[in-house]
């Protein structure tokens, strides 16, 4: 099992008796369902998991659940034998964005206090913005990302003691000896190849086959792009264009999004694509950075709304697109290849995973 640091946050929240329902947001395929299921089954004898996206394309039981009693009736129809007491029953509402009205209902489920709840989903920023009544004060929203470099080290067998020693060195601004530095650089290069998507990391650990890793990365990349298909034809094409252009934008001279290049239309501005940018960012499949005019604090006051840079949410997907199976480009430090965009993406991913605003 992959060690995820968010597991401690989930466990602490569920043990705390907090009055708020924990809502885990994040891109698909980053491990939300798996880690919630793992912690939930560990802490609660009765664990009820309901995938609302699956329900929305199947029985549609929860489509018209408008009240707390409606909700409980439907839960009892499929998992009634697991409905115990609040302290021993956790109801996990997965893919909650499939039924936006359930986001509003979280407040009433919390007030009813019959069971313990946790929820997860993607595109929750967009969904909450479109929800008629946002349950402010009733939920605690936390975003989850692919594995960061530290989690990748854990996955590859580095223990808590070694990680703590490295952190102490870093905080003291002390250098590593040559052997340890070489080992860490080797691990970092492998992280650039594999990235942090759990399926790709597991494939690497199980097979050490970069072809298998690349196949998974390509599938997830295509899945992210195709996920925009729920929108009308014009908008989904714009989203796909912007998403597909992220790697090439990082490689061009300006290294940022140029509105006129998205569709090749002169006079296009960022205002023409606000909804499309919002989709990619809210879905968690793109990380956004705004340029600043002057490097003075607070930075947000000098940020330029029309100067935007987008990164892919996973460095492994980027290296898959740019280099395919040419692992020597990264492992051998070929001077003829500029890895600037790869390092930028890795740093952006690391910063945002640790709670820093880009």
Predicted feature locations:
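Structural recognition of the conserved hydrophobic beta-strand(s) that form the central parallel beta-sheet
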Residues: 116-122, 143
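Accessory nucleic acid-recognition modules appended to NTPase machines
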Residues: 202-358
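Conserved lysine of the Walker
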Residues: 32
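Interdomain motor-coupling "hinge/lid" segment immediately C-terminal to the ATP-binding subdomain
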Residues: 128-251
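Short glycine-rich substrate-engagement loop in P-loop NTPases that contacts/grips substrate
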Residues: 54-86
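Hydrophobic positions on the alpha1 helix immediately C-terminal to the Walker A/P-loop
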Residues: 35, 39
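Hydrophobic anchor at the beta1->P-loop junction of P-loop NTPases
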Residues: 24
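Pre-Walker A adenine-sensing motif
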Residues: 2-17
